[in-house]
Amino acid sequence: MAVYTDVAAEELADFLKAYDIGELLSYKGIAEGVENSNYLLHTTSGSFFLTLYEKRVAIDDLPFFLGLMGHLATHGIVCPQPVRTRNGETLGSLAGRPAAIIDFLEGVWPRKPNVAHCAAVGAALAKLHLAGRDFSMRRANALSVWSWRPLFEQAGACADTVQPGLHDFLKAELDHLEARWPQELPGGVIHADLFPDNVLFLGDRLSGLIDFYFACHDFFAYDVAICLNAWCFEPDHAFNVTKARALLGAYHRERALSEAEQAALPLLARGAALRFLLTRLVDFLNVPAGALVKPKDPLEYVRKLRFQQRVGGVRDYGVAILGPVA
């Protein structure tokens, strides 16, 4: 979450008149993430999140995102629901941006994920994949393999200013992945951005999945690969096989990974690393002046990608081939 668009108190109070959530007491911007402008609201009825949609979020995609959150919440997934106006709308306009009010969930995201956190995330991700099967709306992954070359072309000319040799490294990896990307794997609705700051915990109990604004249809195993990269590396950049084993095992117990998915996982993890490397690089090079935002380090994903390039199979993630679930 982040803040790119400032909202005046009077303007916000007027916006909230359309909702039955009480009077505004206070609000503050949240300076995490890179996609939308987010505020925490306190009203006489409780706490809520306000999101103003910016940058890569297309207005036409918002009914999918908001509808998906509502669908998942009614199918056993702990996630925020959009708050409707008195007229039944989930989407409004504020400060020249599309805007929505979202339920507040209790919990904090884990700054130092442990093995129990990783297991909980694996199980929750599998349940999300299963719960999304009968969601009627569809959205293609706008940041899948076909989108990576345009991102590279957008940022590649400046890549070597971030790290010498980065341009050629990115080009070689992109060529490799485009030639080998899988065509047929089980798929459906995926979260596509389930990083630690998008998962809330109360102790070791998972209390919420948030930020569904990259959700789309793609391979389930690609979503798993994103989580391996996001949850299973230590601050010193070492890969933690114990965390990976916990995440994969918990996922597999809820939704069995096929042999084809397991075989593809190392390549998908390379692709997931490249995707976040490229979008972080673009964001790093294009942070708006004065924005209340902390650009994320693209070089973190260079290191993760180099690890994934050396992976020979799921055994390198700390597990044998995962068999049928009893």
From Swiss-Prot:
It comes from the Bacteria. Coiled coil: none annotated. Gene3D superfamilies: 3.90.1200.10, Phosphorylase Kinase, domain 1. GO terms for biological process: threonine biosynthetic process. InterPro entries: Aminoglycoside_PTrfase, Homoserine_kinase_II, Kinase-like_dom_sf, Pseudomonas-type_ThrB. Its EC number is 2.7.1.39. This is Homoserine kinase. It comes from Nitrobacter winogradskyi (strain ATCC 25391 / DSM 10237 / CIP 104748 / NCIMB 11846 / Nb-255).
